[in-house]
Amino acid sequence: IAACRAGGERVLALADEYGVETLETISAHNMNLSEQALKARISELPSGVSSTHEWVEYDGRGTPELYELFAEMRAENGTLNFRFSGREQVPCFINGAQGGIEGNTISPILVMLAYDIPFNEGIWRCINIDRGEPGTIVNPVNPAPVSNAHMETGAKIARMVSTLISDACSASDSSLLRSRAAGQASSASTGTAWFGTNREGNLSVFFPMDLAVAIGGPAQTVADGQDVYGYQSTLSIGFPDI
C-alpha cells in the first residue's frame, strides 16, 4: 500500500512538472519500445508448440493429493501464446485465481527473456494467456477458495513456463537465448507460522520468509546455482540477514 501511494504521488509530480500530455506520450513510447524489444527476442525462438505438465501437492485435509495440470506454449510472430488446463477445482485454497496464474506466467518471462527490458504494458502485449474451461484449478469459479493461488497452482504454472522457455531457448539459433536456458527454480517452501508473547506481553504472530527465498537456485549456463533463490514469482523479496 505504501509503495502504491508513493508511486502515485511521484506520477502526479511528473504530471505537474511536464504536463499530462507529455507524460502520456513518453509513457506510450516506452511501452512501444518494450514491446518491440521483447517481440524481437521472442522471434529468435523456434516457432512451434511445446507442452509440459506438473502436479500441485496438497495434504491440508489429512490425505496427500496430487492435482495434475498442463501447459502448452506456442511461439509465433513475436508472441508467446500459453494455454493451461487442469483437473476440476477443489474445495481448498490451492485453486489458481487469475492474478496467481497470470503473475506466475510472466515472472519466468521477465527473468529469462525480458531481463534487460523495462517492464510495462508493452511486455504484456507479447503474451496471450488462455486458462481453459471454467471450473478447473487453473480457471476456478465461485465459490472456489483461492487464497493461496500464488503459492500453490500459481507456483506450478511458473515451473511449467520456465521449463517451456528453457526448452525453446535451448533450440534457438541465438547463442544469447541458448545461454538463458536454466534448471528449475524450486518454487516451493516450508511454510511456518511462529507465535509467542512479545516484549509488551501481547500475542505476536509472524511468517518468516527465509524458507521461501533462501534456497539454492537452479544451475544456469552463467552460474552454478548456489545463489539465494526460491520462488520465481518473488523477484525482489528481501529478508534480514541475521
Enumerate the language-model features and the residues they cover:
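Glycine/proline-enriched, intrinsically flexible loops and inter-domain linkers
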Residues: 1-242
